[in-house]
Amino acid sequence: MLKTFLAAAALVAGLSGIAHGHGDEHETVYGKPGDPKKPARVVQIVMREQDGKMIFIPDRLRVRKGEQIRFQLRNNGAVDHEFVVGTVEENLKHMKEMEKNPDMEHDDPNAKRLKPKATGELIWQFTKAGTFDFSCLIPGHRPAGMFGTIVVE
């Protein structure tokens, strides 16, 4: 009986620790996942191939520190594309990982992969000032021009 009680107490303590830390687990230097219940500025991002390049339209954004953005993503291209928010350094590092595993799909709050002609949404709150990156990290796409800049002021 004592063993059962101690095991249950350990389980409850562990779960309460998980619940306690949940709110900040995705905080990054470029922000955190947005709250879909809160207002957000809508920014439409189109992904496509054009004249031998792969591009985002627009490829430069200005955001206020603390602002929440609802990215409405549309892949108008003929191949899969993704939208990954991060620092340039993080995205370049992850791009190298993607070269080793090109079929890697993301299930992260800062990334969304879309099939051709598909749409999707990503909500992100930019909590710190700085210059950040968004990229398509599918092998060959970023070097073909598929990246952009987010300036948070």
Annotate each language-model stretch with its function.
Residues 36-68:
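N-terminal edge beta-strand
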Residues 1-6:
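Bacterial N-terminal signal peptides that target proteins for export
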Residues 53, 99-108:
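Short beta-strand and strand-turn-strand segments in soluble, beta-rich domains
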Residues 7-16:
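Bacterial N-terminal signal peptides
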Residues 89-100:
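Short aromatic-acidic-glycine turn motif
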Residues 15-28:
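Cleaved targeting-peptide boundary
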Residues 58-84, 120-128, 152:
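Beta-strand cores of secreted/periplasmic/IMS beta-sandwich domains, seen most often
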Residues 22, 108-153:
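Extracellular/periplasmic metallocenter environments
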